[in-house]
Amino acid sequence: MAAVWQQVLAVDARYNAYRTPTFPQFRTQYIRRRSQLLRENAKAGHPPALRRQYLRLRGQLLGQRYGPLSEPGSARAYSNSIVRSSRTTLDRMEDFEDDPRALGARGHRRSVSRGSYQLQAQMNRAVYEDRPPGSVVPTSAAEASRAMAGDTSLSENYAFAGMYHVFDQHVDEAVPRVRFANDDRHRLACCSLDGSISLCQLVPAPPTVLRVLRGHTRGVSDFAWSLSNDILVSTSLDATMRIWASEDGRCIREIPDPDSAELLCCTFQPVNNNLTVVGNAKHNVHVMNISTGKKVKGGSSKLTGRVLALSFDAPGRLLWAGDDRGSVFSFLFDMATGKLTKAKRLVVHEGSPVTSISARSWVSREARDPSLLINACLNKLLLYRVVDNEGTLQLKRSFPIEQSSHPVRSIFCPLMSFRQGACVVTGSEDMCVHFFDVERAAKAAVNKLQGHSAPVLDVSFNCDESLLASSDASGMVIVWRREQK
């Protein structure tokens, strides 16, 4: 049963940064050996119920030993090492479509527990108020965590010293997406409508473009790093997705869109990086198995418009998709089969394209509810609360920005749970990068970075927030350096 052993390995990988923090080589050897043993045991034919029980017990034991997990990309997750996961995403996995063990005894598809988002806030508060000894949970007395975050106010913490570097290799063509590698301070990638993807290294100085990935015949609309940063997946207006090896830049596989439509966005399934979800111009989302190049059976659904944005919750059981008609759909993701079940629909604003969706399970000490950050062409940045296990959204507040036509994106800051307040960052058509405190009732603006000469389309923090990258519609990528306190 490939699905369960991949979930077990994903749990181990997420805790791997906390094992022997002074011996990163041991952590790497450990996770590789775990991957090997789990793959071997997957062929032993153990009863599915026994495997699921093992997964639950494994998660409970690791949680008791190391404490609650932080959000992916946070400084705690970084923990002195950029090695989080083995290179499992390049292994040949079993296709969910053809795996008879993904079926129950009578041939029915199994579903797994999806958890209750309705109880998520209560659970978070329970962890906060009744945490076990030795666990790492943000509190008002979390001096070490505050020190990691700078022990300063949000305004002071998000003061920037200026530009660290400017990349202009994609000048004259928009750069719709820029992303730091997972748990990495100095590795950056960006994609361009010129049809290429750049991999950049910021240290040692001077920053350099390591390689440019070429192969798409039209603009690259989106890309994503795998959990272990060994591969990237990209989507393009040429109706294909490509799988790239980040180490040498080679194209591992080219996968055509099942509908032969322009591909507009993509995201990895966070628990099983062998699966990638893509959205296209024919209003469809598809779950793709990147090892086989096939669409997963039952992993497709239709929206009301062109699919522009995708985001999973941290456990990988809820997927949100936004389209150019102003709707956001939630889907239940079956971990055992890869099947999508449409759950809820929210009309943000009829006819206003939803260009960005970011999910977060724990925003801050003051905002411990699962949240969704959404950009739509409304001249507003929207923050929603996730209120139940089907992804129902409730508007919490909005922030003024300029966005009426461009595909602007936004992010939650990776260290926000370690300090008083919580910050989000967004691009804007006024050519600025805006910072907002989601907990401040009045005057939520924290900072504004000026330097772009075109609408800012995307922003990305590295894992410790020492650097911020922003890209714009003219092809410029600016890396900003935060002031050291």
UniProtKB/Swiss-Prot annotation:
Modified residues (Phosphoserine): 70, 74, 79
GO annotation, cellular component aspect: centriolar satellite; nucleoplasm; plasma membrane
Record's subcellular location: Nucleus
Keyword Acetylation: yes
Residues bearing PTM Asymmetric dimethylarginine: 114
Keywords tagged on the record: Acetylation, Methylation, Nucleus, Phosphoprotein, Repeat, WD repeat
Tissue: Widely expressed.
Pfam families: WD40 (PF00400)
One of the GO biological process terms: negative regulation of type B pancreatic cell proliferation
Signal peptide: none
Modified-residue entries (Omega-N-methylarginine), positions: 114
Chain positions of WD repeats: 162-202, 208-246, 250-290, 295-335, 341-389, 394-438, 444-482
InterPro entries xrefs: WD40/YVTN_repeat-like_dom_sf, WD40_repeat_dom_sf, WD40_rpt, WD_repeat-ST_regulator
SUPFAM superfamilies to which the protein is assigned, alphabetical: WD40 repeat-like
The keyword Acetylation appears for this protein: yes
Source domain of life: Eukaryota
Molecular function in Gene Ontology: promoter-specific chromatin binding
Protein name, as recorded: WD repeat-containing protein 13
Native source species: Homo sapiens
